[in-house]
Amino acid sequence: AKQKQDMNDLMVNELYIAASSDAEGNFELTRNHKLFQANYLMGAGDYRAALNSYKELNSLFEQNQQFWSNPPIYYLSVLEGVLGSLRSVGNYNEIPYFLEKLRKLIAEDSSLEFKVNATCLLFQYELFPYLDKGNFAECTELMSRYQETLYDKEAWLSPIRKSELLLYTTLIHIGNQNYKAAKKYISNAIIDHNIKYLPLMRTIRLVRLIAYYETQEFELIRHESRSITRSLSSPKEQTFKTEHTVLWF
């Protein structure tokens, strides 16, 4: 109850600051206010109101293109946050609305690097409704449609985007029981030293173990298991039941 009251107090205070600072005429302040409001409503479980706030936030960006960075990295990150929130609550029906905004953003920007990284994000959120439900036939078809615009240009991807692409591609191949292809993709997922502590990297290492097991690469399993065990033994590292289960198995 106290935490809920604290959040309510924070919300009231944020609204007061926005109102007293002439938020309507200030893009950055209004943007931050809308983003806070949407995240607050999502955290409070009012998903319908949160969705409306996300749409208002998107409209704000569309009406203030003169304030965008070049390329529009911040707008892209906002769209990614919205899509991630919708996926987290299983609201797949609203994802296409924001995917259309993402497609428009990709079409209008001239930077190849930005286009490819944004296309990777587009691919992921077209993929998740199928992947999350285990519809691997649709996943495979979607992969083929993105061969030219994404897979053939993966050299332009940031380390995180490339790692995400390789991980989800591996999961599709595992779902199709195509374990050799799964091993090929997950083996190419480099543990970049700049991002090796992200949860994504730990997921990649566990999926790599699964691919090695299915292809009977037992020496690689022993090597990778020892490496993961060493990293998990650090007092700074939080470990999860899934990790212990996979390593024990």
Report each predicted region and the residues it spans.
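Amphipathic helix-loop-helix modules that constitute alpha-helical solenoid scaffolds
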Residues: A1-S21, E28, S233-F249
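"A position-specific structural signal for the A-helix of alpha-solenoid helical repeats
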Residues: N32-F36, Y74-G84, A118-F128, D132, ...
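C-terminal structural cap/anchor segments
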Residues: H173-L247
